[in-house]
Every structure is written in C-alpha cells, then in structure tokens.
C-alpha cells in the first residue's frame, strides 16, 4: 500500500485512496489476517499522509524498520468478535488466550478496541480501550500550590526545598548492562546463544523501564493527592538533551513522561497542572527580593543575592515557578 501511495504521489502529487481489500487477490495470505487489523493499518497510513500534507516538516511517510519498529496491531470490537471472560481473551481469528488482568473492568464499560504488542523480551501485552462515562472531576478552587523545577540529578526539586530523589536506575545498572551487551556482541548473529543473550539484555532494559515507571507513578500519585495545583516550567526537553549534551541523563529520569502522568492524575481529580513559559527566568530571579541577575552559569549551584538570600539554585527556581504559577492561575481564574 505504501509503495503504491509513494508512486502515485511522485506522479500526481496527491494521496492514493487504496484499501487492503484490493490486495487480497494478489496476496492470498492477507485473507488469514484479521481484516479490522488491516483496516487500522490503512487508517494509520492515511493519517501519516494527511499530517505530511498539513505539516511538511514532519517528513514524508516511510517504511518502518523490520528489526527496530514496534511490533503491534490493533483490532476493533464489532458484533461481539472480541470476548473477555474468565481470565481469557478471545480475539478475531485466534483461539482464547489466558491473560493476567491488570484490574477488573467496571460494569457499564463498553469494549471498543484491543492493541496487542510484543516487547523485545518476548512478553505480549493487550491494551484494552473502553467507552465509559467521563471520569474527570469538576474543577475545584485551588488553595494548596507547589512549585517544581527540573533537575538533572533527582529528576525535580520542589518549592518546599525537598528533592524527588530519583534513584537513576539506568546509571546504576549501566555497568552490568554494558557487560551483557558485550557478551551479545561476541555471539554469532542468529545463533541460539545470540537469541538467549538478546532476550537477557532486553529483560534488563525492561526492568529499568518498569522501575522508572513505578517510581514516577507513586510520586505523581502522591503529589496529585496532596496539592490542588502544581506549577512547572514548559521546557523543551529535546533541546536540552541535544544542546547541552544531557541526553542520557534526561532519558534516564524520564521527566517528560513524569509530567504526563502528573497531568492526567491532577485532571482526574479536578486539579491543575500550571505550565510557566520556558523563557521565564526562574533561575536568575531572586525569590526573596525579585532582583534579576544578568548572568548565571550552570556551575553556580548556590544562588547568592545582594539582599542576603543564599539558596540552592534549583529550590530558588522552584519558588519562582510557584509564584509565577499562582499569578497565571489568578489571571485565568
């Protein structure tokens, strides 16, 4: 489908409207595949082209890597073709598969679609999408505010003076992971030992990812429970990672993922995630007297002001973000 779309675009400069049904005669094995899964692939492909036509900067749709792309497919619930019962999941053109259910499904929820994915470690996951009533609470009056500033070490610092204390899971496991990756590089590609070692490396990465997500879920839950509004900087994390060569550190603490978790947890409770403009000089302004320094290098970890204020620069920035967040809230309210 993509090859035909590319060819048609090169000739006509338009998107070809082709469907999976038109290829089943030429490729009979497509009849063995769930037709709704093929339809979802078609929708994803058309969406990629529409986005390209709207925003050429995103790039022309291209072929996905066979080795490194995410292995998944999505199917839809139509006329009871998907069944979830007694710890078994029945998908179209498949026998019922025993599953470990993450949580019980409330009554009244309607199953809409299922996305099945395979992790590099060989584990399979099914993400179930349900249609339900709006679970978001009504917005409440914010009384308890918290300022939060991004930090390379510990993930973030709060206006209370506390640090998140993120354990840097990837950094701690880096030596062990490097040793296992060296073993993998010495194995003959495609051999049984290569596959075993590849799975072992994938399990290390999966463990690090799960540790990170567990820490972030617990912290974001705690903040969403304790505060009515959390004020953060709207940072360009990709720019920081590339421009300041902090890529590995930022990817390790997963600050962007943490903000996403915190955002939806606050929204579910009718609370607020207030984003302060990224160009707001939170680090240069004194949180006590309001004086703004002309220059402040990254090596200066203590903020010193002529008024006598002596404070950790990250805590000082978090207090300034808190004040600016309160101002934005009052203005919008």
Labelled PLM ranges:
Residues 1-333:
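Nucleic-acid substrate recognition interfaces
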């Amino acid at each position: 489908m993509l090859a035909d779309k590319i060819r048609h675009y090169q000739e006509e400069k338009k998107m070809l409207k082709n469907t999976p049904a038109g290829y089943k005669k030429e490729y009979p094995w497509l009849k063995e595949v769930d037709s709704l899964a093929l339809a979802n692939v078609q929708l994803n492909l058309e969406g990629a082209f529409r986005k390209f036509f709207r925003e050429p900067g995103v790039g022309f749709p291209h072929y996905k890597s066979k080795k490194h792309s995410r292995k998944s497919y999505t199917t839809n619930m139509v006329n009871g073709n998907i069944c979830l019962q007694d710890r078994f999941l029945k998908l179209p053109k498949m026998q019922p598969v025993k599953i470990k259910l993450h949580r019980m499904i409330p009554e009244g929820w309607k199953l809409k679609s299922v996305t099945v994915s395979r992790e590099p470690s060989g584990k399979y996951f099914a993400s179930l999408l349900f249609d339900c009533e709006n679970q978001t609470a009504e917005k409440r009056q914010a009384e308890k505010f918290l300022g939060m500033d991004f930090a390379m070490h510990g993930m973030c610092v709060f206006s209370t003076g506390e640090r998140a204390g993120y354990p840097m899971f990837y950094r701690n496991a880096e030596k062990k992971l490097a040793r296992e990756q060296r073993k993998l590089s010495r194995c003959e590609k495609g051999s049984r030992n290569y596959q075993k070692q590849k799975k072992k490396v994938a399990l290390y990465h999966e463990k690090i990812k799960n540790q990170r997500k567990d820490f972030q879920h617990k912290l974001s839950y705690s903040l969403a429970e304790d505060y009515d509004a959390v004020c953060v900087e709207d940072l360009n994390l990709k720019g920081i990672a590339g421009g300041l060569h902090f890529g590995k550190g930022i990817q390790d603490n997963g600050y962007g993922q943490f903000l996403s978790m915190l955002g939806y947890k606050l929204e579910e409770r009718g609370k607020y995630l207030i984003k302060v403009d990224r160009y707001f000089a939170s680090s240069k302004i004194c949180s006590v007297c309001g004086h703004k320094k002309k220059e402040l290098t990254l090596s200066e970890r203590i903020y010193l002001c002529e008024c006598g204020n002596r404070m950790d620069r990250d805590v000082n920035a978090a207090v300034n973000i808190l004040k600016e967040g309160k101002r934005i809230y009052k203005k919008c309210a």
